[in-house]
């Protein structure tokens, strides 16, 4: 398990002013590629509830009140909070609000990249880290939409069959490597590195117009992990 303090020191050796308040990471840092980056994220395998979602949005909107600068989103989440209270108050709308704010930042001149350094599960990942212009992951990261046993209970497909399918298709399989094959992850880092972060930021800042385009389906086709998405979108576009 990555200790957040060690992660921050490895990513931002030029210095940072970042706080970890329970499950919330927020602050600013200096990098070799940008004088100032805003850093927002989750820690301790946080289950994202309505309160945490609003805290993420609060810090995102505070950054947007200032001059444009890159956003670095750090991801360690066990997914959305699975509590009756959260469902009753409409947690899905809170998560949608987080996704909208990250997307609004992207379209407002705040280029973003996310780094999965711990867990990345379900809605906690989809609404935040996966919304960035570029998504990276440490090799040790645990990425999945749903545990195969939970998937078996819901779909009524035997667990053994899902294990077999996961071995054949990255769509069913957890892990950073499988998400990279599907195009969801830009690249996998063996360890947290300021050199890798600076290179990723430099690429992002040098090609901001391209960065705002979503090429994940093309990456999925090139890497052999998602073969139909790009062709389907192209066919729909050609039929207009």
What positions do the PLM features span?
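STAS-typified acidic loop motif
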Residues: 7, 28-54
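A structural preference for short, pocket-lining loop segments at secondary-structure junctions
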Residues: 36-41, 55-84
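Conserved catalytic cores of soluble enzyme domains
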Residues: 83-197
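N-terminal short beta-loop-beta anion/metal-coordinating cradle
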Residues: 15-34
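Short, hydrophobic/amphipathic alpha-helical packing segments
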Residues: 53-61, 95, 129
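Short strand->helix junction
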Residues: 45-46, 80, 119
